Amino acid sequence: MMHKGMLWIATAALMGSLALMTPASAQDSAMQGFTVNAGIFYPSKKSVRQASEDIWFSVDLGYKFQTSEPTESGYYYDLGVSIGYRGAGGASYIPVHLTFTGYLNEQFFYRAGAGVGFPKSGDAAFSYAIELGYNFSAGTTPIALTIGYAGIQRGDVNGFTVGLQFQF
């Protein structure tokens, strides 16, 4: 019961922080927006794969609420939040993260997220994710390929991610 209560509290806090955020005066509101990253999650522990499935479904919804000004070399970063789902069979977890995304240039970026993970069985724990990405479309709906590693502090739901990210 406490597990679901914490999920609702974390979700309410996340949504409340989004409602209260205002863009910095230097940032362009066109640079803000949502991202959806859908793909696969491959648990790193064999025991987890044997208890559920080898490959899990993975999806994240992110929102960037602040974008920095680019440096002379073109580097800039976003601050944001994300909520996701990773699961297959009877196993799953929901990560709720604050995110930092650094853009090295027009194509390459990296992302680090930290927050709370809510596994289907067990108590909530510290959750994290790191990703590398490559933008291969810069049109009206940018598309990127991402690879990374995500998990929770308990270590039973950690693994590799591969996904396609859409920005709108």
Give the ranges of each region predicted by the language model.
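Cleavable N-terminal export/targeting peptides
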Residues: M1-M31
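Short glycine/proline- and aromatic-enriched beta-strand/turn motifs that initiate or cap beta-hairpins
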Residues: T22-G84, G159-Q167
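Ser/Thr- (and often Asn-) enriched beta-sheet segments in non-cytosolic proteins
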Residues: T35-N37, A144, G151
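Generic secondary-structure microfeatures
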Residues: I40, I83-G87, G102-L104, F108, ...
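Solvent-exposed loop/turn segments connecting transmembrane beta-strands
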Residues: K46-I55, Y85-I94, V116-S127, A150-T161
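Feature captures outer-membrane beta-barrel proteins of Gram-negative bacteria and organelles
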Residues: W56-P70, I94-E106, A124-A138, N158-F168
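Repeated loop/turn-to-beta-strand initiation elements of outer-membrane beta-barrel proteins
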Residues: S68-L79, Q107-Y110, F136-L145
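Outer-envelope exported proteins of Gram-negative bacteria
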Residues: G80, H97, R111-G113
